[in-house]
Amino acid sequence: MDIIKGIDAAQLKKDIIDFNTGDTIKVHVRIKEGTRERIQVFEGIVIKRQGGGIAETFTVRRISYGVGVERTFPVHSPKIEKIEIVKHGKVRRARIFYLRDRIGKAAFKIKERKNFK
């Protein structure tokens, strides 16, 4: 069991910023197309963060051309170049799936957290 923990510890990223559910973030993802590699930015609201250790994931939701798009990322994935926080949101739930039912501008309405560290 200690061997598995040692391998997992070697794979963990050290430079992960602290973000929570309700925050608006930009995820810079490395995408390989044939021989070329480029970085694509996916900006949206974090609706879920789950798991722990190497298996920790988060889901980001955004509206693209009137259609809701959700993407789940592993936190410690080598394909994630960096994560930027655009806005800190104030929510009272760990999973804010109620945003899926909202249409238009209401899909983005989350109060901003003023006193954050």
From Swiss-Prot:
Listed GO CC annotations: cytosolic large ribosomal subunit
GO biological process, one term: translation
Pfam families (alphabetical): Ribosomal_L19
One of the record's GO molecular function terms: structural constituent of ribosome
Key word Secreted present: no
Keywords, comma-separated and alphabetical: Ribonucleoprotein, Ribosomal protein
Presence of keyword Ribonucleoprotein: yes
SUPFAM superfamilies associated with the record: Translation proteins SH3-like domain
Top-level taxon of the source organism: Bacteria
Family classification: Belongs to the bacterial ribosomal protein bL19 family.
Xref: PANTHER family: LARGE RIBOSOMAL SUBUNIT PROTEIN BL19M, RIBOSOMAL PROTEIN L19
General function of this protein: This protein is located at the 30S-50S ribosomal subunit interface and may play a role in the structure and function of the aminoacyl-tRNA binding site.
Name the record gives this protein: Large ribosomal subunit protein bL19
Source organism of the structure: Alkaliphilus metalliredigens (strain QYMF)
Gene: rplS
